[in-house]
Regions:
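Aromatic-lined carbohydrate-recognition surfaces of secreted/lumenal glycan-active proteins
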Residues: 110-122
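Core dinuclear metal-dependent hydrolase active-site scaffold
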Residues: 86-89, 105, 111
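Charged catalytic cores and adjacent phosphate/nucleic-acid-binding surfaces used
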Residues: 1-5, 9-13, 17-26, 46-53, ...
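Short, well-ordered coil/turn segments that N-cap beta-strands
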Residues: 1, 31-34, 59-63, 107-109, ...
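Divalent metal-dependent hydrolysis catalytic cores, especially in the metallo-beta-lactamase
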Residues: 4, 8, 24-44, 110-112
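Caspase-like (clan CD) cysteine peptidase catalytic core
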Residues: 91-93, 97
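Short, well-ordered beta-to-alpha junction loops that form the rim of enzyme active sites
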Residues: 40, 114-117, 175
Length: 240
């Protein structure tokens, strides 16, 4: 079963242009059976699904609850908690990485760095926390090894880390636009129905594979050097 494990929907991420229903339809057309909603520091996109769509449409498609968390010191971290576990603290950006990992694990969840070899401040290996505490990578449950919006060298670096530290590698599109949806995915040997199913598969380190194709129309590709200013703005925002 293929799942896009890095999805931003309009109902939850202010920088996404894709409503969750369009996301689902596009994924279905590509033969992908599920998605992990990972909006920035909010579960609002998933709440929209749960409150207005779930059980009424797309009953053969799996929508899972996740989040892309903005840490104080280590960039963006993908988090999955068991269904039924409500963690409003995860919607308050800015926890330091070590505290975040302990909090997630204490409550039965898993976490891993998004695009770990990507942009400065946003990606774990390009932060001061990695330089000061590289051993923290051992505490991750997985590493995102394919992100459709990252360049090949970034994903290759992530794959190297996953192999070096014995972590499962996940994949996702990181889509904010419709034409990027489904360009990255994680493939599991069994069907995933719930967040707990996903957590178990990753913890068991089964035959999980990541893959996809590269998306070359990202905002950072278009705006060039101005992207560095935006990245610094993200860092400053998380310091607030």
């Amino acid at each position: 079963m293929k799942i896009d494990m890095h999805c931003h929907v309009r109902e939850g991420s202010i920088d996404s242009k894709v409503p969750i229903e369009e996301f689902i339809k596009k994924l279905q057309s590509k033969g992908i059976g599920g998605m992990l909603v990972t909006d920035h520091d909010t579960y609002n996109g998933y709440r929209h699904w749960k409150n207005t769509i779930k059980g009424r449409k797309y009953k053969d498609f799996v929508v899972l609850k996740g989040i892309e968390y903005d840490t104080l010191d280590a960039g963006h971290i993908l988090i999955i908690m068991p269904q039924g576990v409500k963690m409003r603290l995860l919607e308050l950006r800015g926890l330091p990485l070590s505290l975040l990992i302990d909090f997630v694990h204490h409550n039965g969840g898993i976490c891993g760095p998004a695009h770990p070899c990507g942009e400065k401040y946003l990606s774990f290996t390009n932060t001061k926390r990695w330089q000061k505490s590289p051993e923290l990578i051992e505490k991750f449950d997985f590493i995102e090894t394919f992100n459709a919006c990252e360049p090949p060298q970034s994903n290759e670096g992530a794959k190297y880390l996953a192999e070096k530290y014995g972590k499962p590698g996940t994949g996702g599109s990181d889509a904010h636009k419709l034409d990027c949806v489904g360009m990255g995915y994680t493939e599991f040997p069994v069907r995933i129905e719930t967040e707990l199913d996903l957590i178990r598969q990753i913890r068991e380190k089964g035959e999980i594979q990541s893959g996809g194709e590269y998306y070359t129309k990202t905002t950072k590709d278009k705006i060039g050097k101005f992207n560095k200013l935006l990245i610094f703005s993200f860092w400053f925002y998380n310091r607030g």
